[in-house]
């Protein structure tokens, strides 16, 4: 009698590493974690370091750190000096030559945070793809997260790449982002851009859908518990529905005359609206990077210039944009030494 004993298959280093990365632990690592965790750690650490210690005196002529007296709303990691162009500003590059202090003064931390932040966001999206595949569900979470990634990449990377340097990107700070919004309005008339309009419709529409959906579900919960708190009547593993889709459909049919009767369409619509808003606004920002114009009603501008009594909300906004450009440019770009004589500063038609 012959007994054959099978030899266990050889496990290579890749299989061992794959098992370790995908092990069930409190914080899942996975292959995406190799990209996500180091880049997110460095991006957040760089931002905390910059807002705490690093000045923007050499790049923007302003104070931007807690050390200089800023608070959480006014501190920022500022963009590099305009003279740096689109350099990656590597610490060991020709600009800083390994000098960490000089690297910080030139704005190297901004490039560091922006690039590591972009890769961290991509790593987080890949993490959602990876876990969805392991759990056996569809990857719509990752697809939805492509919206914020598109906005980050278009605003912080694509826009300054279309301009003369990284200097014109937003700095990483609350007040700094507000300044960038004013800049986009003054120099690009961004609020009148159709892609901005689609973005606003998507984001605010998504918020409205979220509020309506949450309220409707709360309105139509089944009375399936004796407790005073209705939340205690729900069990995550229960098989039966927790709210009545039929009742919700009847309610909104009476309100609007039309309502979703399919939960799958309803939730896809709630996914589609805000994500499309993010995507379209990202496309618009790329248009601004190329200095494309949208909705310039020149005929109204010409008539307003010829007729002091003719003015529209559009022409008033154009004057405001001129004011933003004239008063913002000297303060925002001190290295250019802009000086505007009084006669070229914008004045209303009635003045």
From Swiss-Prot:
Binding, a plastoquinone: 213, 260
Disulfide bonds: none
SUPFAM superfamilies from the UniProt entry: Bacterial photosystem II reaction centre, L and M subunits
Keyword set includes Acetylation: no
Catalysed reactions, as listed in the record: 2 a plastoquinone + 4 hnu + 2 H2O = 2 a plastoquinol + O2
Binding site for pheophytin a: 128, 141
BP term (GO), one: photosynthetic electron transport in photosystem II
Cofactor note: The D1/D2 heterodimer binds P680, chlorophylls that are the primary electron donor of PSII, and subsequent electron acceptors. It shares a non-heme iron and each subunit binds pheophytin, quinone, additional chlorophylls, carotenoids and lipids. There is also a Cl(-1) ion associated with D1 and D2, which is required for oxygen evolution. The PSII complex binds additional chlorophylls, carotenoids and specific lipids.
Class in the EC hierarchy, top level: oxidoreductase
Binding, Fe cation: 213, 267
Domain of life: Bacteria
Binding-site residues, chlorophyll a PD2: 196
Transmembrane segment boundaries: 39-59, 123-139, 151-164, 206-226, 277-293
Subcellular location: Cellular thylakoid membrane
GO molecular function: chlorophyll binding; electron transporter, transferring electrons within the cyclic electron transport pathway of photosynthesis activity; iron ion binding; oxygen evolving activity
Keywords of the record: Chlorophyll, Chromophore, Electron transport, Iron, Magnesium, Membrane, Metal-binding, Oxidoreductase, Photosynthesis, Photosystem II, Thylakoid, Transmembrane, Transmembrane helix, Transport
Keyword Magnesium tagged: yes
Annotated Gene Ontology cellular component terms: photosystem II; plasma membrane-derived thylakoid membrane
Pfam families: Photo_RC
Binding site for chlorophyll a ChlzD2: 116
More about this protein: 2 of the reaction center chlorophylls (ChlD1 and ChlD2) are entirely coordinated by water.
Subunit structure of this chain's protein: PSII is composed of 1 copy each of membrane proteins PsbA, PsbB, PsbC, PsbD, PsbE, PsbF, PsbH, PsbI, PsbJ, PsbK, PsbL, PsbM, PsbT, PsbX, PsbY, PsbZ, Psb30/Ycf12, peripheral proteins PsbO, CyanoQ (PsbQ), PsbU, PsbV and a large number of cofactors. It forms dimeric complexes.
Role summary: Photosystem II (PSII) is a light-driven water:plastoquinone oxidoreductase that uses light energy to abstract electrons from H(2)O, generating O(2) and a proton gradient subsequently used for ATP formation. It consists of a core antenna complex that captures photons, and an electron transfer chain that converts photonic excitation into a charge separation. The D1/D2 (PsbA/PsbD) reaction center heterodimer binds P680, the primary electron donor of PSII as well as several subsequent electron acceptors. D2 is needed for assembly of a stable PSII complex.
Cross-referenced PANTHER family: PHOTOSYSTEM II D2 PROTEIN (PTHR33149:SF12), PHOTOSYSTEM II PROTEIN D1 (PTHR33149)
Protein name: Photosystem II D2 protein
The organism's taxonomic lineage, starting at the top: Bacteria, Bacillati, Cyanobacteriota, Cyanophyceae, Synechococcales
Gene behind the chain: psbD1
């Amino acid at each position: 009698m012959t007994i054959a004993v099978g030899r266990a298959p050889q496990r290579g280093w890749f299989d061992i590493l794959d098992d370790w990365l995908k092990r069930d632990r409190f914080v899942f690592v996975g292959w995406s974690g190799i990209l996500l965790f180091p880049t997110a750690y460095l991006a957040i650490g760089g931002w905390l370091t910059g807002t705490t210690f690093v000045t923007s005196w050499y790049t923007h002529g302003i104070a931007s750190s807690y050390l200089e007296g800023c608070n959480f709303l006014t501190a920022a990691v500022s963009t590099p000096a305009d003279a740096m162009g689109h350099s990656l500003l590597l610490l060991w590059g020709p600009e800083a030559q390994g000098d960490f202090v000089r690297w910080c003064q030139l704005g190297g931390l901004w490039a560091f945070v922006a690039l590591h932040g972009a890769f961290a966001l991509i790593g987080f999206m890949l993490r959602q793809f990876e876990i969805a595949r392991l759990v056996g569900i569809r990857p719509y979470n990752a697809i939805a997260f492509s919206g914020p990634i598109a906005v980050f990449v278009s605003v912080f990377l694509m826009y300054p790449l279309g301009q003369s340097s990284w200097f014109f990107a937003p700095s990483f700070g609350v007040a700094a982002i507000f300044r960038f919004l004013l800049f986009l309005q003054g120099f690009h008339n961004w609020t009148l851009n159709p892609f901005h309009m689609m973005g606003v419709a998507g984001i605010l529409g998504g918020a409205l859908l979220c509020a309506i959906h949450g309220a409707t579900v709360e309105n139509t919960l089944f009375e399936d518990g004796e407790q005073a708190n209705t939340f205690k009547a729900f069990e995550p593993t229960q098989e039966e529905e927790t709210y009545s889709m039929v009742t919700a459909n009847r309610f909104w049919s009476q309100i609007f005359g039309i309502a979703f009767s399919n939960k799958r369409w309803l939730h896809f619509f709630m996914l589609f609206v805000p994500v499309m808003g993010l995507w379209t606004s990202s496309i618009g920002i790329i248009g601004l990077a190329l200095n494309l114009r949208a909705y310039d009603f020149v005929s109204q501008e010409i008539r307003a210039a010829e007729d002091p009594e003719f003015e529209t909300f559009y022409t008033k906004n154009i004057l405001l944009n001129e004011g933003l450009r004239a008063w913002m440019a000297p303060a925002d770009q001190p290295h250019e030494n802009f000086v505007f004589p009084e006669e070229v500063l914008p004045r209303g038609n009635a003045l």
